[in-house]
Amino acid sequence: MIEADRLVSADSSGFEEAADRAIRPKLLAEYVGQPQVRSQMEIFIQAAKLRGDALDHLLIFGPPGLGKTTLANIVANEMGVNLRTTSGPVLEKAGDLAAMLTNLEPHDVLFIDEIHRLSPVVEEVLYPAMEDYQLDIMIGEGPAARSIKIDLPPFTLIGATTRAGSLTSPLRDRFGIVQRLEFYQIPDLQHIVSRSARHMGLEMSDEGALEVARRSRGTPRIANRLLRRVRDFAEVRHDGTISADIAAQALDMLNVDAEGFDYMDRKLLLAVIDKFFGGPVGLDNLAAAIGEERETIEDVLEPYLIQQGFLQRTPRGRMATVRAWNHFGITPPEMP
């Protein structure tokens, strides 16, 4: 099973990137959710503009699909500067990064997605650039090699990662601002779905938006993907208007249940309940029972189930919680 193939995957495709770009908020005033992040960034941006300085370097981390790229775009728009975008895996050589840095205008924003995947060689170049706005470049080889310094304009580096723990301490410590994005509350997701529906020219009731929001796993990217599929259903099977009932019919047809679980989530939980009496069950046994790789279970399926309190990871193996039993209408066994 490939994670990107799942309707409830938080990873994005190229098509979705283009589609979502058109409906993303452009300014903090339009930004929904993450109230603490929004209020802090308002102050930091306003202070930098009052001083005429570049904004401090910003690290944004959190699960995929929560709007790290959106926030980077908003910062650049609020500061009134250009945004240059790249990603960790693309910057293979020190020269790749040097070329981007030397083309920046004063106060520009350089956004590096998946910054935890920077190579050590590239990361070394980044340290003096972030700290002193200077590039240290080696010219020549062997005994004739010499270091030259190139001054850079003041700029803001925004790094985004789903794995903050994978960043090296020297890199992490050079970010003056660190923001964690949390899963969205249902009312905020409902607002996002309604806003996206308006941008797409859809007629959608508040209850319809709420139904989509409830099944979106706290993730705007998933909410927008589900909205597009509900739109298809409404246009083909009905008159295009999306009510709560039509949204529920569409999502049920797509095998996305009331908790946002798809077929694979339910298959894993039911295997623990039915085949292993609720657990504990070892990861290898569970992988064999559902026909998946253990890495897929650990990295793709488990995290959301554990976060939502449906699965427990114990020293003796995986266990289904009472909430998981109740979700399927099965009476949990009496605790000894």
UniProtKB/Swiss-Prot annotation:
Residues annotated to bind Mg(2+): 69
UniProt-listed GO biological process terms: DNA recombination; DNA repair
InterPro entries per UniProt: AAA+_ATPase, AAA_lid_4, DNA_helicase_Holl-junc_RuvB, P-loop_NTPase, RuvB-like_N, RuvB_C, WH-like_DNA-bd_sf, WH_DNA-bd_sf
Region of interest (Large ATPase domain (RuvB-L)), residue spans: 4-184
One Gene Ontology CC term in the entry: cytoplasm
Top-rank taxon: Bacteria
Head domain (RuvB-H), as annotated region: 258-336
Keywords: ATP-binding, Cytoplasm, DNA damage, DNA recombination, DNA repair, DNA-binding, Hydrolase, Nucleotide-binding
Record Pfam families: AAA_lid_4, RuvB_C, RuvB_N
UniProt GO molecular function: ATP binding; ATP hydrolysis activity; four-way junction DNA binding; four-way junction helicase activity
Gene3D superfamilies with a match to the protein in the record: 1.10.8.60, P-loop containing nucleotide triphosphate hydrolases, Winged helix-like DNA-binding domain superfamily/Winged helix DNA-binding domain
Catalytic activity as recorded in UniProt: ATP + H2O = ADP + phosphate + H(+)
UniProt binding sites for DNA: 294, 313, 318
Presence of keyword DNA repair: yes
Predominant place of localization: cytoplasm
Region (Small ATPAse domain (RuvB-S)), start-end ranges: 185-255
Function recorded in the entry: The RuvA-RuvB-RuvC complex processes Holliday junction (HJ) DNA during genetic recombination and DNA repair, while the RuvA-RuvB complex plays an important role in the rescue of blocked DNA replication forks via replication fork reversal (RFR). RuvA specifically binds to HJ cruciform DNA, conferring on it an open structure. The RuvB hexamer acts as an ATP-dependent pump, pulling dsDNA into and through the RuvAB complex. RuvB forms 2 homohexamers on either side of HJ DNA bound by 1 or 2 RuvA tetramers; 4 subunits per hexamer contact DNA at a time.
Domain notes: Has 3 domains, the large (RuvB-L) and small ATPase (RuvB-S) domains and the C-terminal head (RuvB-H) domain. The head domain binds DNA, while the ATPase domains jointly bind ATP, ADP or are empty depending on the state of the subunit in the translocation cycle. During a single DNA translocation step the structure of each domain remains the same, but their relative positions change.
Similarity comment: Belongs to the RuvB family.
Subunit structure: Homohexamer. Forms an RuvA(8)-RuvB(12)-Holliday junction (HJ) complex. HJ DNA is sandwiched between 2 RuvA tetramers; dsDNA enters through RuvA and exits via RuvB. An RuvB hexamer assembles on each DNA strand where it exits the tetramer. Each RuvB hexamer is contacted by two RuvA subunits (via domain III) on 2 adjacent RuvB subunits; this complex drives branch migration. In the full resolvosome a probable DNA-RuvA(4)-RuvB(12)-RuvC(2) complex forms which resolves the HJ.
Name the record gives this protein: Holliday junction branch migration complex subunit RuvB
Species annotation: Klebsiella pneumoniae subsp. pneumoniae (strain ATCC 700721 / MGH 78578)
Lineage: Bacteria, Pseudomonadati, Pseudomonadota, Gammaproteobacteria, Enterobacterales
